């Protein structure tokens, strides 16, 4: 392969120029993440590991541990140049530099030459994710990994138009499980819909997105993991498999490239590295990593949890309290103390059933997303939802950007608005639109109008009517 790329699993891609590995993205070589919940769908081969080790450049999209996998980075030679998006807070830059790597922050929308025929551009965004654009010869590869577009759709569409459609590729997440799914009612009964009810819509949305961007090829990426903790294996049926994509893909003019493939950008041909897409289920354990669900918090430890929640002034407008259930002991932490006089049925809150060690690690390091994505924690919703406020505010703005107060949030918003005003409005309008559609679905179901409205909406966006 003179010029091309290969997919190694999850979000790791390796780009080649003249048969030489030039760039590896989000290297996760072995081990687990999310408190031992996720493992690689299949272990890397020695050749795949060697390709990552030989690449001169490493690009890290964001701070989630399946992308920024510290144990994997520690295995790489320190002569690498690590490229990073221009994220709001320098924590990732500083931590990787402290490991001994040379670190370069890629300015927004500026090309960086990596080899004679390969150059790259990075688009950081307010979700604290990063999108990588790689030009290799006369081909263009957009690595969305698991980032939302965040107002970059217009820019990417105009960029992709400059290339032969057959030579444009978008590598993207296609998954429903890479976020909190483990919702329960007050009796502890899981309330998430069956997998088949959720998978189709996700696959349709990805197909629609790739088509709208104008790309000719979809590369399945950032989705190849398996749940291996005893208390998270229940989520494995919710993983979107390649068979699911084959069954429900709705844009036949967009070529699908399955996981674990090598793509020759000179010819456009690709070949599979494995005869099947079988997951390495032998990695599944009967253990819960470092957690003991019966362990309780001490008084000092409860105080640490309380102080962690109190840091988030940005939550006050949207939530009254958070409940934590640890070792069968339930405690309420008030976000709005003035709400104590309200009737319970009017309060807005979220309850988390969570083991001690993972909770304390989350409180110490501040990355609440990790405990949500692991899907071993159970979540109760009381007149509240995780989106559009809780997860973005506590996990993205708080954990990644270190934005906790309303004034800090205003400064944060100004940064992204000034850089791309139109994209900023488009992205925020899309979020309000999604919230509005959720209300429409809720009311249409109660008024008996769900079916006709669904038919109209799906015809408007070009999805199947089923």
Question: What are the functions of these language-model segments?
Answer:
Residues 44-110:
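Active-site HxH/HxHxD metal-binding segment of metal-dependent hydrolases
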Residues 84-139, 247:
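Metallo-beta-lactamase
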């Amino acid at each position: 392969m003179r010029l091309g790329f290969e997919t190694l699993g999850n979000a790791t891609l390796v780009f080649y120029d003249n048969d030489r590995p030039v760039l590896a993205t989000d290297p996760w070589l072995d081990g687990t993440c999310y408190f031992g919940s996720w493992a690689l769908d299949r272990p890397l081969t020695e050749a795949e590991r060697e390709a990552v080790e030989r690449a001169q450049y490493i690009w890290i999209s964001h701070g989630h541990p399946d992308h920024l996998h510290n144990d994997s980075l520690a295995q790489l030679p320190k002569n690498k140049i690590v490229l990073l998006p221009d994220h709001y807070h320098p924590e990732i830059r500083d931590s990787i530099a402290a490991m001994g790597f040379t670190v370069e922050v890629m300015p927004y929308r500026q090309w960086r030459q990596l080899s004679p025929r390969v150059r790259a551009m990075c688009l950081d965004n307010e979700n604290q994710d990063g999108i990588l654009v790689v030009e290799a010869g006369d081909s263009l590869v957009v690595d969305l990994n698991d980032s939302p577009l965040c107002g970059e759709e217009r820019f990417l569409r105009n960029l992709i138009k400059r290339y032969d459609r057959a030579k444009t590729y978008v590598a993207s997440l296609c998954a429903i499980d890479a976020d909190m799914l483990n919702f329960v009612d007050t009796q502890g009964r899981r309330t998430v819909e069956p997998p088949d009810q959720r998978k189709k819509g996700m696959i349709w949305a990805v197909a629609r997105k790739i088509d709208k961007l104008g790309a000719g090829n979809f590369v399945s990426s950032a989705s190849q993991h398996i749940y291996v903790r005893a208390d998270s294996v229940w989520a494995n049926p919710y993983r979107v498999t390649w068979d699911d994509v084959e069954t429900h893909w709705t844009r036949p003019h967009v070529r699908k490239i399955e996981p674990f493939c090598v793509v020759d950008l000179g010819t456009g041909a690709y070949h599979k590295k494995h005869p099947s897409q079988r997951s390495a289920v032998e990695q599944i354990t009967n253990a819960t990593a470092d957690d003991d669900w019966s362990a309780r918090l001490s008084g000092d430890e409860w105080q640490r949890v309380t102080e962690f929640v109190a840091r988030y002034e940005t939550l006050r407008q949207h939530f009254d309290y958070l409940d934590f259930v640890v070792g069968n002991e339930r405690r309420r932490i008030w976000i709005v103390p003035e709400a104590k006089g309200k009737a319970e049925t009017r309060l807005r809150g979220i309850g988390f059933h969570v083991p001690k060690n993972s909770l304390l690690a989350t409180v110490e390091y501040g990355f609440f997303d990790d405990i949500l994505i692991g899907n071993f924690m159970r979540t109760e919703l009381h007149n509240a939802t995780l989106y559009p406020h809780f997860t973005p505010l506590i996990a993205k703005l708080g954990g990644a950007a270190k934005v906790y107060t309303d004034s800090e949030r205003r400064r944060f918003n100004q940064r992204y608005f000034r850089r791309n005003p139109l994209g900023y409005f488009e992205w925020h309008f899309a979020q309000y639109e999604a919230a509005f559609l959720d209300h429409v679905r809720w009311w249409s179901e109660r008024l008996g109008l769900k079916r006709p409205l669904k038919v109209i909406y799906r015809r408007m966006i070009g999805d199947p009517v089923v």
